[in-house]
């Protein structure tokens, strides 16, 4: 965090937060008028269980809180909203970003189809928060049951958080 240029931090916020707010705001009036529509805001498991990237986790937590808050206000309008919180997904994202992921256990990877299927199933079921993949459902559930201090310690030790903020 402290080693990044302010412009890099702002760019992350622009993509992860500002664009979500602006696109949601742009789409809602027509959906509300039609009493129909669905919005899926892409968050991350990192928004539910803070990890190594503090600014990334914080931006995704914003998306989760924003979506949950908006869901209450949309009740009865015919418009559904969801925060999609996937874990690691097999896409070109990490490679393009130059993030080395070879040490990540295979069991933590999700396929794109798993994420899409989970998202659509949860949207149909009326779930505001969608966490695709059994492994991530377990992780987020357990993380919600243990003290935050333990999560912080695990983040420091297991996930080598030092220097990646």
Report the location of each language-model feature.
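Substrate-binding pocket helix/loop in short-chain dehydrogenase/reductase
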Residues: 1, 5-10
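A short helix-coil junction within the Rossmann-fold of NAD(P)-dependent oxidoreductases
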Residues: 26-35
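Residue(s) in the substrate-gating loop at a strand-loop-helix junction
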Residues: 44
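C-terminal helical subdomain
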Residues: 83, 103-139
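Active-site-adjacent segment of SDR/Rossmann-fold oxidoreductases
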Residues: 49, 69-80
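Short, flexible catalytic-loop segment of classical short-chain dehydrogenase/reductase
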Residues: 86-96, 100-102
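Active-site helix of classical SDR
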Residues: 24, 59
């Amino acid at each position: 965090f402290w080693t990044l240029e302010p412009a890099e931090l702002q760019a992350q916020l622009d993509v992860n937060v500002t664009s979500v707010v602006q696109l949601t705001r742009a789409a809602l009036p027509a959906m509300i008028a039609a009493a129909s529509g669905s919005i899926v805001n892409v968050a991350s498991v990192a928004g539910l269980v803070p990890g190594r990237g503090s600014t990334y986790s914080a931006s995704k937590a914003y998306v989760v809180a924003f979506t949950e808050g908006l869901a209450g206000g949309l009740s009865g309008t015919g418009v559904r909203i969801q925060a999609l919180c996937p874990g690691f997904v097999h896409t070109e994202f990490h490679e393009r970003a130059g993030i080395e992921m070879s040490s990540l256990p295979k069991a933590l990877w999700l396929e794109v189809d798993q994420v899409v299927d989970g998202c659509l199933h949860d949207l149909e079921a009326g779930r505001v928060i969608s966490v695709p993949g059994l492994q991530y459902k377990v992780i987020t559930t357990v993380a919600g049951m243990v003290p935050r201090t333990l999560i912080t310690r695990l983040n420091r030790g297991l996930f080598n958080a030092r220097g990646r903020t």
